[in-house]
């Protein structure tokens, strides 16, 4: 197989791994932690996962010292935490 073919195969495998539904992967343990705004005084829009509703919810993140249940975007939150319906 040529090097171009190997690169294409590697790219397809990487894409497949990224697009694998969350149901076939374990949810990140931080997703079950309560939301924590952090201790700094910044006002950064962020998202946290709410297990009781299986949704990502927007909140204001202070910018530091929070737990892992905060994400820069709704998309990142859903990719890490949300269960498929």
From Swiss-Prot:
Disulfide bonds join 31-81, 40-64, 56-77. GO terms for cellular component: extracellular space. InterPro entries: Kunitz_BPTI, Kunitz_BPTI_sf, Prtase_inh_Kunz-CS, TFPI/VKTCI-like. It is found in: Secreted. Gene3D superfamilies: Pancreatic trypsin inhibitor Kunitz domain. GO terms for molecular function: potassium channel regulator activity; serine-type endopeptidase inhibitor activity; toxin activity. Residues 31-81 form the BPTI/Kunitz inhibitor domain. Belongs to the venom Kunitz-type family. Beta-1-bungarotoxin is a presynaptic neurotoxin of the venom. The B chain is homologous to venom basic protease inhibitors but has no protease inhibitor activity and blocks voltage-gated potassium channels (Kv). This is Kunitz-type serine protease inhibitor homolog beta-bungarotoxin BF B2 chain.
């Amino acid at each position: 197989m040529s090097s171009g073919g190997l690169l294409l195969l590697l790219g397809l495998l990487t894409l497949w791994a990224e697009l694998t539904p969350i149901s076939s992967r374990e949810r990140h343990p931080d997703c079950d932690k309560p939301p924590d705004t952090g201790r700094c005084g910044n006002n950064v829009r962020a998202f946290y996962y709410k297990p009781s509703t299986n949704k990502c919810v927007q909140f204001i993140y202070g910018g530091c010292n929070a737990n892992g249940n905060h994400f820069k975007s709704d998309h990142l939150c859903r990719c890490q935490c949300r269960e498929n319906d």
